[in-house]
């Protein structure tokens, strides 16, 4: 069982960026691409994962999601360009 919590950013087909929370990044991206994800992404498929971060607790992940959602597009793009820290838990 996966005990980690993730915040992720996907780039939509219209080049917009969507930030979300999940416990399974691969499943969530598949859901977005199948039209079963957030209402925002349904008309903007396909989406591509550009960034994710891993957390030990749901509250930490949701706090980070809220923080990233307040970022400008430029700051979100910077996160995507920096990549994902694969050494996270």
UniProtKB/Swiss-Prot annotation:
Organism listed in the record: Haloquadratum walsbyi (strain DSM 16790 / HBSQ001)
Pfam families linked: GIY-YIG
CDD domains: GIY-YIG_UPF0213 (cd10456)
Family (UniProt): Belongs to the UPF0213 family.
Residue stretches making up the GIY-YIG domain: 3-78
Protein name: UPF0213 protein HQ_3675A
Signal peptide from the UniProt entry: none
